[in-house]
C-alpha cells in the first residue's frame, strides 16, 4: 500500500492521527484539509503502522501526502488503496473534473439510481463509448468510479483536468 485515491465525495485530512485535541478553549478539531473524490495521495504509513517520527497510528488511520504536498492523516474508509502500477494506470486515463456538484447515476437518464453525489473538484475516469452509445446517451458521460463501478453523469457537469496529480510522487 503506497498510494490511495479518495473514495468519498469529500475526505477529511487531519493534522494529527487523532481527530480532536486539547486547545486553549477546550477540545478542538485537528482538521487540516480535505481530499476530493478521485484525487490521488501517497500513503506514507499504512493504518496501524509506525510513522518515521515513531508515532503508532490507530488501526484505521493512514498517514498520507496529497498530490500537492499536504501532509496529514486520513481514515482508511475514505481511501481506495492502490498499487503503484494501478496509480500510474489511473493517472494515464481520460480523467475529468467535476465542475459542479453532480449525481453519478446507474443509467444515462434521470431515472437512474443515484450511486453517489460528488462535489465540485472530484475526479472521474471518463470511459470510451461506441458511436451508437454516444448517440443513445446524448448529454451524458460514462464514467468509472474508484471501486470499479460504471456510472453516468451529465456531461455539462464535467471539465478537463487542468493540473497534474503527480507533484509529490
What are the language-model segments listed below?
Residues 117:
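A short glycine-leucine-enriched loop at secondary-structure breakpoints
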Residues 1-30, 36-96, 100-103, 107-114, ...:
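Boundary regions of SH3-family modules and the immediately adjacent low-complexity/disordered segments
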